[in-house]
């Protein structure tokens, strides 16, 4: 709101125009001299420059350089009708109606260069839109560069068919209605000097509501309302040494983190299990759950680049951090629950937990670029990422059933778990590329990448091998590429990766895969350009217990037509065809093996034609829109036609209006459809 008020005071500045033409005209007698024939001999400079004794000296001509330039777009969004599922609309679009500051962009310059030489300000989406930003950059040559960046995202996700066994009734058990805010500030001192200190601060926070599931003893899931709060602050500072042959950066930073979430429920709530267990139905009547996390970390970073010879560049980077966290958890619940391992029903439970963890984390990278010949480049890069977790959790659980007077009868003895475990993850990568310019038009690239690592992490709850699980990673990747410029108008780029893996971490990891990409661009003339793109991925894991297969393709064609520099008409269009097909084995509820399949065949198209109105070339109309349609496991259709109109009212003022129609539908989940018209109309002030 403060920003909007400040903008209102700035609007009058757009109305100020450059000095009137009458003030810039010369005096009548000066006009006559200026309009004299070119062949008339000019008077000597010393004579023409001397003013007459009886005439005062003329005032210097006013400067036409403006200290302020920019534009502001504001208007009102109107949604006259809406039909369909409001939660799906908010999960995909989430546009509201009312006054909006759609865009702000201006520049301030100080001719006297006092506090700053130049200041740039930009803002977008203010007034209630789900994504709004503000950005400021100020600089004074040789003294400082300051950048401030603010972003706010309203994230809503409550698709009824997701994580909801009762769909279309009930609600998404993984729902979110939160705001995420991010602020970044960077200050660089003495920019352009050999030694440049800098300071930076980052703040990221989230707050809002949601729905999550509470799971007692893996027997049932209960969807409960949740309050979400978290924030992270990062402080860093350092110095850069910049010389002709080498650059060095030394940085020290720290991070603080906190997360405070809580869930509560009162009243009878049934879980996802609809069938009875031993003749009884499980339910939840009350719940109070809280957990808090606090974390800190200090890190050190050093990086350097050097050019010892004209044919050799070297670089390296090292980062060490040691984050530490503490956790506190508690819950107390009443209802009808069961311990399947002892076939015992109980009416209440209480859990208390605390823990601490420490994670030394080391990351390093190094590499070089060597140019033994003008047409040949050799690039080598190596990186390693290693961290070790040391954790010590302490958890107590107690169960009760019924009451005897004021005495709660224990249903089962309290359990206490005190664990000490560690996790270790090591990741390494080495890559070599050779790039050869075979001719002035043809460049070839070949390379090899080797990825290896090992990990020992906390196992899942159904693990039969103990609390920890170990794995290894070995992957060999071949690389190839081609860049061919047949003429100034035609260029082609090809890239390929082929891999064979001995060990992987996850069932769906890249294993034996091939990935390719092709791009082509042809410019028929100065007005017409066509671009094409093709990508493909084929990943296979033939392990008899996995049998994972993933095939994905994407083909796109785009056209840009701008005759006569788009003064009267321009056209942009793009069509995209994509397919995804995957299969993998899994174990069902009774350990019966089955196959999970997913398929999606999609078509996406976008087009926009801009036309200058007859007799009013400054007025523009845009006709176009986009659509998405897919067939397969989740068939869906999404249409967005649009019309835009921009009409100049006077030199610095434009009237802009836009209409869009949003239509979304699914064949299998028809209750998730919505349709709406959205209008926005407003003005643009320009100076």
Whereabouts are the PLM-identified features?
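Sec-dependent N-terminal signal peptides
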Residues: 1-16
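Gram-negative and organellar
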Residues: 50-70, 77-687
């Amino acid at each position: 709101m403060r920003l909007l008020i400040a903008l209102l005071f700035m609007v009058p500045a757009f109305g100020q125009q450059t000095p009137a033409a009458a003030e810039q005209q010369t005096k009548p007698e000066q006009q006559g001299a200026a309009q004299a024939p070119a062949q008339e001999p000019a008077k000597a400079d010393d004579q023409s420059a001397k003013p007459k004794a009886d005439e005062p000296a003329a005032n210097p001509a006013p400067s036409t350089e403006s200290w302020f330039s920019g534009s502001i777009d504001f208007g009102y969004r109107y949604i006259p009708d809406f039909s369909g599922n409001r939660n799906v609309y908010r999960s995909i679009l989430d546009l509201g109606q009312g006054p909006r500051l759609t865009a702000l962009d201006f520049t301030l310059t100080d001719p006297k260069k006092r506090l700053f030489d130049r200041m740039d300000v930009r803002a977008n989406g203010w007034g209630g839109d789900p994504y709004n930003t503000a950005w400021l950059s100020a600089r004074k040559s040789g003294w400082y560069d300051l950048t401030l960046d603010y972003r706010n995202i309203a994230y809503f996700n409550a698709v009824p068919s997701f994580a909801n066994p009762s769909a279309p009734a009930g609600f998404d058990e993984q729902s979110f209605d939160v705001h995420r805010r991010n602020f970044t500030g960077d200050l660089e001192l003495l920019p352009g000097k050999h030694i440049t200190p800098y300071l930076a601060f980052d703040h990221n926070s989230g707050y809002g509501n949601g729905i999550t599931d509470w799971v007692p003893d893996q027997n049932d899931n209960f969807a409960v309302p949740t309050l979400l709060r978290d924030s992270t602050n990062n402080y860093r500072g350092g110095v850069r040494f910049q010389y002709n042959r080498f650059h060095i950066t030394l940085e020290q930073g720290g991070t603080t983190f906190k997360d405070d979430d809580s869930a509560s429920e009162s009243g009878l709530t049934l879980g996802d299990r609809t069938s009875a267990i031993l003749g009884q139905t499980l339910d939840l009547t009350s719940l109070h759950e809280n957990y808090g996390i606090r974390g800190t970390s200090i890190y050190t970073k050093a990086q350097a680049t050097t050019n010892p010879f004209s044919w050799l560049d070297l670089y390296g980077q090292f980062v060490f951090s040691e984050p530490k966290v503490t956790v506190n958890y508690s819950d107390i619940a009443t209802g009808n629950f069961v311990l399947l391992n002892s076939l015992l029903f109980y009416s209440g439970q209480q859990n208390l937990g605390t823990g601490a963890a420490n994670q030394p984390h080391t990351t390093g990278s190094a590499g070089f670029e060597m140019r033994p010949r003008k047409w040949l480049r050799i690039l080598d890069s190596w990186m390693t990422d290693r961290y070790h977790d040391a954790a010590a959790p302490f958890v107590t659980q107690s169960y009760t059933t019924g009451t005897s007077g004021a005495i709660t009868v224990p249903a089962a003895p309290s359990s206490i778990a005190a664990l000490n475990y560690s996790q270790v993850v090591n990741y390494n990568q080495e890559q070599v590329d050779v790039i050869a310019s075979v001719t002035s038009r043809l460049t070839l690239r070949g390379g090899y990448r080797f990825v290896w690592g090992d990990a020992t992490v906390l196992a899942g709850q159904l693990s039969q091998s103990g609390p920890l699980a170990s794995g290894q990673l070995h992957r060999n990747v071949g690389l190839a590429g081609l860049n061919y410029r047949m003429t100034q108008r035609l260029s082609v780029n090809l890239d390929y990766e082929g891999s064979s893996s001995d060990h992987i971490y996850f069932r769906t990891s890249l294993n034996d895969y091939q990935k390719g990409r092709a791009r082509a661009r042809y410019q028929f003339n100065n007005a017409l350009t066509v671009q094409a793109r093709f990508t493909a991925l084929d990943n296979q894991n033939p392990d008899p217990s996995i049998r994972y297969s993933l095939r994905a393709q994407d083909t796109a064609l785009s056209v840009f037509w701008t005759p006569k520099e788009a003064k009267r008409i321009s056209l942009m269009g793009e069509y995209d065809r994509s397919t995804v097909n995957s299969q993998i084995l899994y174990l069902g509820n009774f350990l019966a093996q089955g196959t999970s399949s997913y398929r999606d065949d999609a078509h996406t198209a976008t087009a926009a034609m801009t036309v200058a109105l007859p007799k009013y070339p400054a007025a523009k109309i845009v006709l176009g829109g986009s659509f998405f349609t897919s067939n397969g496991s989740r068939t869906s259709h999404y249409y967005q036609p649009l019309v835009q109109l921009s009409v100049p009212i006077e030199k610095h003022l434009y009237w802009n209006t836009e209409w869009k129609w949003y239509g979304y539908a699914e064949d299998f989940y028809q209750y998730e459809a919505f349709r709406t018209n959205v209008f926005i109309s407003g003005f643009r002030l320009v100076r």
